[in-house]
């Protein structure tokens, strides 16, 4: 089915939005990716660039938790802790409680989500872009 969607997309020059946790599908089907955590975009850019050089800790964790059929076997990563409750408004860095390498700025929860340029057409949350 995905191949048929891709054919129609290419034939008609359509843009499509895929929402998925399936990293393999995203890698195959998209040119640009937006990674979201707790309802906010934490990294966005060309799929190849984001996969090759992730700049946000959550993106890195997603990639490290994905099995590969190529190369040597590796232990898949999982994140400690629980995702934040989305019932109440989140202020500051929503990922810091689960981040393996949070900065002091992230931990103090006084930051707001702000995407900064980290590469050509590649942007990541300012708070966590130094945590990878």
Specify the residue positions occupied by each region the protein language model found.
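P-loop NTP-binding/switch modules centered on Walker-like glycine-rich loops
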Residues: 1-74
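Charged, flexible cofactor/metal-binding loops and thiol motifs
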Residues: 47-132
């Amino acid at each position: 089915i995905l191949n048929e969607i891709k054919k129609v997309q290419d034939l008609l020059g359509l843009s499509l939005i895929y929402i998925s946790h399936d990293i393999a599908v995203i890698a195959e089907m998209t040119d640009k990716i937006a990674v979201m955590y707790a309802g906010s975009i934490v990294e966005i850019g060309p799929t190849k660039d984001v996969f090759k050089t992730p700049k946000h800790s959550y993106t890195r964790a997603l990639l490290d938790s994905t099995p590969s059929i190529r190369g040597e076997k590796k232990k898949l990563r999982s994140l400690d802790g629980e995702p934040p409750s989305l019932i109440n408004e989140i202020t500051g860095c929503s990922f810091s409680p689960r981040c393996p390498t949070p900065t002091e700025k992230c931990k103090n929860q006084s930051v707001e989500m702000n995407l900064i340029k980290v590469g050509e057409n590649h942007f990541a949350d300012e708070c966590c872009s130094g945590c990878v």
